[in-house]
Amino acid sequence: GLWQLIKDKIKDAATGFVTGIQS
């Protein structure tokens, strides 16, 4: 549902943020 989509978006954003910090 919508909540799952939102959680996926948040997880993607968090992962991208962490990856950007590390590299």
From Swiss-Prot:
Expressed by the skin dorsal glands. One of its GO terms (cellular component) is extracellular region. It is found in: Secreted. The keyword Ion transport does not apply. GO terms for biological process: defense response. It comes from the Eukaryota. Keywords: Amphibian defense peptide, Secreted. Coiled coil: none annotated. Has no antimicrobial activity. This is Dahlein-4.1. It comes from Ranoidea dahlii.
